[in-house]
Amino acid sequence: MMLDDFIKEFSKDKEKKKKVSDLGNIPHGSEALIISKISEYIKKDILFICENKKKYNQIKDVLNFLEIKNVYFFPEYDTNTYDRISPNKNITSERVKTLIELKFSKGNKIILTTAKASSQFIAEKQSSYYKNLNLETGGEYDLVEIKSFLVEHGYTNTSYVREVGEFAIRGGIIDFYPFNYSSPVRLDFFGNKLDLIKTFDANTQLSHDQNLDDINIYPCDEIILNNELVNNFRSNFNLEFGSESKNSKLYESVSSKITYPGIESWLPFFYNSKSTIIDYCNDPVIILDNSIFEIINDFEETLIAQYKTRIEFDSEKENTEKYYSLSPDQLFLGKEEYRNIVSNHKQLQFSSLKNPKGVNLNANNIQGFYSSDKLNKIDYQSLKNTINKNINDNNSVFLACSSEGSRLRLSKIFKNQNIDSYLFDKFSDLQNINKKGIGICVLNLSNGFFLEKTMFISEQDIFGEKFYRSRKVENKNFLKDLSSINPGDFIIHVDHGLGKFINLTNLKIENSYHECLMLEYRNNDRLYLPVENLEMLSKYNSDNENIILDKLGSNVW
């Protein structure tokens, strides 16, 4: 079925409220285009729930690339629930910004999140705890109040601002680094008058030339340590764990309005009631991957195992050293409750497979242009024929590269292969470009697809999977050589998650021996990784004494 035909039928069918529709044969990477198309027809909020962070990041990139309006992002934490580590401030800041804007935004919206994030309890929608501070050039402001806002809303006072979530005050100058800016911001006051707003270089500390007219400061943390919320926490904590818990480091830190590492694991104690991101949406149509409920089941199993380990840990510790964990059902929706809440909304389930009983989209994945049996053998003639055929059929053809360097390299290769191409940065650029051939852009797309009149080819489609590396991954986090890890160290595999390095071993594969790293996962499952693929691992550092390994084959990671 053509996408437009399906959307018209889906949007007109009022009786499908609280029922599920299925749409199959959806190529990986095309979800953002489909969501944006659906939003044009359905005059309601759309909540898209991704199966994992990897898919979330890819769809987020494509939505930004398409410059879709009224899109909001609610990512999951980059930490395990019971770790004594707080999430990255870029993540918490973006979550709070989304919660603030969802409360006051008008019109239809697209909200992107993940299975784990959508099941997590957050501050009630009716609360007024989350606020943003708007400052304008020429306005009069109290510097003490600005400092109080920054401290209360999660910014850390430092000598020099270099990282997101930091601020510094020197006389009439306030520097701070909000997550929604690529550079830190400098406020230059003359008395109480805000003279200048500029961004500046975090390394040199030198201001950039361009002035800003105004700036919106959003909180960096989801937990605001003001008097009301601290009192809420103290009351709930005492009620749950008794008077002896007052001696714990967590209780003392919060009582003193000092952020405690991993404080997000007690987030529900700070608020009078709990909500989820679903509650922040206005009677949304929920679009979700068809594996979401299975992922929620696996996630609940993981949480229960982590919680039991924490309880065992607490039983051997003094009151001051106990973790005082909240149970999984205090932090997240259980699998049955999650299913019931989602079922109260009109649903559309996406599947990459063809649905024999449902509706299937008229779309295709791109077949690779490389030879699997010949290293680095690219079939450029086939690539050229595919591009030319689609252009002759009046289809739009684009190539998504993983980096600017890749884009320049591929444009040179195309020139040598007599393949017409042009460069562009975002979708709106296409209106002002003399388009001839294939358009080349930088976009986080691991697989290409053809959807009606649009074809995207990915870098991986040309060079193969082993040569592709997502631009989202910072190479500095990967292990460079075997001397970087020792037996017993915890590692994170880019595909399989948290495991433990056991030792090196030689495996006989097809009559030859290969040196491999033996990695252990939950239930003593083993994964053998060839040493030449060492870059797929990064070292995991945590002060958590009871680390729960990920489960091989689970959808949670």
Feature-to-residue mapping (PLM):
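Conserved beta-alpha structural segments and adjacent helices that either
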Residues: 1-544
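Long, low-complexity intrinsically disordered regions
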Residues: 541-557
